[in-house]
Amino acid sequence: MRLYLSSYRLGDSAGALLALVGNGARAAIVSNALDHIPAAAREAYRAEISDPIADFAALGISAQDLDLQHYFGAPDRLENALRGVDLVWAMGGNSFILRRAMAQSAFDTVITELLAHDAIVYGGFSAGAVVATPSLSGVELMDDPNVIPPGYDPAVVWEGLSLVDYAIVPHFDSPHPESVAARAMANQLAKRKTPFRALRDGEVIVHIGKISDTKELAL
């Protein structure tokens, strides 16, 4: 299992990501964590601030968008799509919306199987990293679990993907609007004695191997 979990965007260790995916890699970008934001605002952000497709192209990675809504109730089609790429990259946004999308498309089941066979790399930042953990408990201090875009199941999915065995707090002590909320989440996890990793923007976790037998680097 190969994971690249970042606090913000690609982080400061893109070379480690390239080492995971290899030369000439193909990536699928999952942006469903932003489905509560109007399309025009999302397009303006990509045009004016950050375009993940361009960011990956600068690394020699060919990327395209993968909208999980197109695969709601169609796990076989989703698996076929994911088998055609080397990396799936989950963008930041609302962690609960992203987790709903992963449940309704069966991404959670498909990605676990592909990772178990080392057929793909899972990467993501902020919400994309948070959902890789065992539980989203505490994340409600950073993201609103009751924001429900059209077409989404209103039930909150609290279970994470359990790709790692600890919680992740992004934007910790960082120049980011959610830094104060991140501190509150970290404090709550510490009070509950829940294992967690707090990541500052720029920091990443590179995870190689099974959870029980893993090589992990905090970069």
Q: Which stretches of residues belong to each language-model region?
A:
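Extended, subdomain-level signal for the structured scaffold at the beginning of enzyme domains
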Residues: 1-96, 186, 190-219
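N-terminal start-of-chain detector that recognizes signal peptides
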Residues: 1-3, 60-61, 94, 137-143, ...
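Short glycine-/acidic-enriched loop or helix-start segments at secondary-structure transitions
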Residues: 14-15, 39, 99-101, 132-135, ...
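Short, glycine/charged-enriched secondary-structure capping and boundary segments
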Residues: 18-20, 42-44, 102-105, 136-140, ...
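A short, terminal or domain-edge coil/loop segment
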Residues: 82-91, 114-128, 175-188, 219
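Class I SAM-dependent methyltransferase SAM-binding "motif I" and its flanking Rossmann-like core
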Residues: 100-103, 108-174
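Conserved anion/nucleotide-ligand pocket segment
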Residues: 159-202
